[in-house]
Amino acid sequence: GIHAEAVDDTALYQLEPALAPGFAGGMLVPRDAVAYGPAVAMHLVERAQSRGTRLLRDRALRLTRDGIELQGGQTLRGSVLVATGCALPELLPALPMRARKGHLVITQRYPGLLRHQTLELGYADSAHGSDDSSVAFNVQPRPTGQILIGSSREFDDAMDPAVSMPMLRRMLERSFSYLPALRGLDALRVWTGFRPTSIDGRPYIGRVPGMDHAWVAAGHEGLGITTALGTAHLLVDLLLERPTAIDAAPFDPARLAAATVAA
């Protein structure tokens, strides 16, 4: 499991003096860390290439009965893993995906203001809830001294990247209520992104129904990086037909086909 420590109010304010007054305590996860997704992905690609893996840069057009066809005209044969996030239905229309839009703000450099990634205990309710829109306090100090401020969630199947000022204001006011010093900081950039969310809130991990050579890993909402290692272990065990460390059934893409038939 993951080690966590309950802390009282005295310890909480020793850890993060800039927090708003009045909190009764919190929870410290000493080994918590922040990973920058693109850098991790590039590291893994380079590591695979150093071991003989060949990297092709192309666009996948469609799955074939024994591989995948690329836009450049090449057809690759063998097992295929589809991990394309919100774009999953382009290759696998039987597995619907919803886009859950989020806003982020990055500030100028303010080293020392915040020492830990800090979030409200109710963050999980926002992340895993089914509300059309929600906000939660989630702030990260970056190695550069900048502060990354989140988080917001709203379903946006049109995938409009435009910043919503009402949602941004709502998210920031939530953050200010936990960390008042944020109100006086200069923001450098505001942007949006989209979290791929399955229709039942559980990711698709496993073999694609009706396709022996195709596998899928998608729909993790905002926990793709956090659960990446567990997802990889589960997929490898399934591919090699080994016993899995956890029950894979709740994540089996076939559950969606079964639900459709039952309906």
Segment roles from a protein language model:
Residues D66-E69, Q146-I147, A214-W215:
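Hydrophobic residues embedded in beta-strands of well-ordered beta-sheets
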Residues C86-P209:
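Active-site substrate-recognition segment that forms the wall
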Residues G37, R170, F176-A263:
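C-terminal catalytic lobe of FAD-dependent flavoproteins
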Residues G1-R51, L56, R62-L63:
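Flavin (FAD/FMN) cofactor-binding and adjacent substrate-gating region
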Residues G1-T10, M97, G184, R242-A249:
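A short alpha-helix-loop-beta-strand transition element characteristic
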Residues Q71-S79:
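Core beta-strand elements of the Rossmann-like FAD/NAD(P) dinucleotide-binding domain
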Residues Y13, A60-L61, V190-R195:
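Short, solvent-exposed loop/turn elements at beta->coil junctions and helix N-caps
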Residues T84-G85, A218:
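Glycine-rich, N-terminal phosphate-binding loop of Rossmann-like dinucleotide-binding domains
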